Amino acid sequence: METDSFKRQYADILRRYLCGISYQKLSCEYDPSIEETVVQHFRTLNFPNDFLKRMMPIIHASAWIATSTYPFTPRHVQEAIAVYTSLAIAIEDTSKESTHDLKRFQQRLFNRQPQPNLLLQAMVDCLVSLRGIYGPFICDMVAKSTAEYISVCAFEAKYDGTLRPTPSSPDFPYYLRLKTGVAEVYAFFAFPEVLYPEEAFLHEYILAVPDISRYFNLGNDLLSFYKESIVADERLNYIYNCSRVSNSTPLESIWSTHLALITCVENIRKTLSASPQMRRNIDQLINGYVMYHFGASRYKLSDLGIQEVDELRAKICCSTTVDNGVGAYKH
């Protein structure tokens, strides 16, 4: 592709996207004490020191996701989200060296057997601990999605780089994206019991969960494309898979993705219009997830000359640097 021209067109689509969702920068800032709490949590799990050192950029990224995307939740909820995210990223990052354990995760889980892998056992313990923070239905959905995610990590470790969907399999790109992104988990994370008890609110927010999940997936696909496929040469991501099944160009797929995202946000706001507080909180989530990508240097969006990115990066560089460095995680 003609890189400079593509960059300009991509940046223009991002500007249109920000306008289309009425993006507003939030006042939330990175809280390093949440990162410290997560680090201490992992120290209690007896992980080797060299592995903890490897985990540090992952924990940093996870704390930024929790604080930027869920600023309306109490601190203990953000800490739980950061712990879960750290484990999810680490499980994917180590999937090629632990494929055997990943494949047997659910078998051991249902047989009530301990996991031989420290990360997998820590994830089981994390799922249990969430039951004091979220309602039973949400915890069931989180456990279900996590089990799928761990299975697909093993799947990708074997088939990564070999699956190329065709026009006869048009639904496969998003099907795979659903499995790899655990977006349903992050949609439900917005509704802890302390804010939205299931007994009173499940029937309201469940209607918005499909679009919130889609927003997480497609939002990451749109905002991570630059670092994946313009700076780097990734050609097997969601955008390129969509191009293959629709016989379109990558730029056309980016355009259609940004339109789908705007529709998601419109649907969410309409669905939650009868619940003003819930809508305000999810608006914070929508804007905060954009801020997460803008503030994390790994996405390299400061290369594009977008005012909103430059303003946020300047603020971050004057305070706490947010750089999630490593990790192949789909968020």
Curated annotation (Swiss-Prot):
Keyword terms of this UniProt record: Lyase
Transmembrane intervals: none
Gene Ontology molecular function: any one: carbon-oxygen lyase activity, acting on phosphates
Primary enzyme class: lyase
Entry annotated with the keyword Transcription: no
Role played: Terpene synthase that catalyzes the conversion of (2E,6E)-farnesyl diphosphate (FPP) into the volatile sesquiterpene (E)-beta-farnesene.
Full protein name: (E)-beta farnesene synthase MBR_03882
Organism expressing this protein natively: Metarhizium brunneum (strain ARSEF 3297)
